[in-house]
């Protein structure tokens, strides 16, 4: 353990914070092309088939992204916009695909929280 004098001469160094979304390179969103669209199963207490896509970003990085909402039109070579935000029960999924932007259609018949799912206002 250092003495008080040693700490005055050379204070403790703080560890740099770990970046939670490295593929975005400091940007709010990034564009990419789907290389694979598939389903995967969540961690232990939960059970489902979660829709995910592997996306090659404009930065050249491959990221696994979650496709939110019910039903989607994504397939290989679809151009998508991704944002940060992990999915707690899917290990390795740190990004979300934005609905209603580029090749991704919005969720049909969505009444509430429409802006998150790219749904137009119902008539």
UniProtKB/Swiss-Prot annotation:
Any GO BP: translation
Molecular functions per Gene Ontology: rRNA binding; structural constituent of ribosome; tRNA binding
Pfam families: Ribosom_S12_S23
Top-level taxonomic group: Bacteria
Keywords: Methylation, Ribonucleoprotein, Ribosomal protein, RNA-binding, rRNA-binding, tRNA-binding
InterPro entries: NA-bd_OB-fold, Ribosomal_uS12, Ribosomal_uS12_bac
SUPFAM superfamilies assigned to the protein according to its UniProt record, in alphabetical order: Nucleic acid-binding proteins
List of residues that carry 3-methylthioaspartic acid: 89
Coiled coil regions in record: none
PROSITE patterns, A to Z: RIBOSOMAL_S12 (PS00055)
Cellular component, GO annotation: small ribosomal subunit
Function: With S4 and S5 plays an important role in translational accuracy. Interacts with and stabilizes bases of the 16S rRNA that are involved in tRNA selection in the A site and with the mRNA backbone. Located at the interface of the 30S and 50S subunits, it traverses the body of the 30S subunit contacting proteins on the other side and probably holding the rRNA structure together. The combined cluster of proteins S8, S12 and S17 appears to hold together the shoulder and platform of the 30S subunit.
Assembly: Part of the 30S ribosomal subunit. Contacts proteins S8 and S17. May interact with IF1 in the 30S initiation complex.
HAMAP family registered for this protein in UniProt: Ribosomal_uS12_B (MF_00403_B)
Family of this protein: Belongs to the universal ribosomal protein uS12 family.
PANTHER family linked to this entry: 30S RIBOSOMAL PROTEIN S12 FAMILY MEMBER
Protein name listed in UniProt: Small ribosomal subunit protein uS12
Gene expressing this chain: rpsL
């Amino acid at each position: 353990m250092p003495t008080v004098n040693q700490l005055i001469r050379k204070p403790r160094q703080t560890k740099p914070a770990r970046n939670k979304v490295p593929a975005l390179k400091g940007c709010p969103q990034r564009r990419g092309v789907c290389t694979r669209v598939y389903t995967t199963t969540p961690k232990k207490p939960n059970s489902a088939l979660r829709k995910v896509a592997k996306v090659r970003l404009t930065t050249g990085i491959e990221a696994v992204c979650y496709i939110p909402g019910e039903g989607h039109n994504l397939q290989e070579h679809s151009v998508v916009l991704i944002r940060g935000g992990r999915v707690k029960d899917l290990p390795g999924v740190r990004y979300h695909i934005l609905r209603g932007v580029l090749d991704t259609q919005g969720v049909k018949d969505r009444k509430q929280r429409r802006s998150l799912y790219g749904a137009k206002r119902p008539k």
